[in-house]
Amino acid sequence: MDTKLLDILACPVCKGPLKLSADKTELISKGAGLAYPVRDGIPVMLESEARTLSTDERLEK
């Protein structure tokens, strides 16, 4: 995924910023507590496709 997209993409649920996961397979929204998958370099920005972050993941910086 092109990291330049992070400058313009926002979480569709909370409208907050997104962060690319360390393994580059998810876009993380701390505000919504969701992780959106990145498939074949394309972010899937659907709430129904996102997974809920664990408590530990929400507390990470």
UniProtKB/Swiss-Prot annotation:
Superkingdom of origin = Bacteria
Q: Which GO terms describe its cellular component?
A: cytosol
One Pfam family it belongs to: Trm112p
- Of which family is this protein a member? Belongs to the UPF0434 family.
Cite the HAMAP family for this sequence.
UPF0434 (MF_01187)
- Protein name in UniProt: UPF0434 protein PSPPH_1629
What taxonomic classification does the UniProt entry list for its organism?
Answer: Bacteria, Pseudomonadati, Pseudomonadota, Gammaproteobacteria, Pseudomonadales
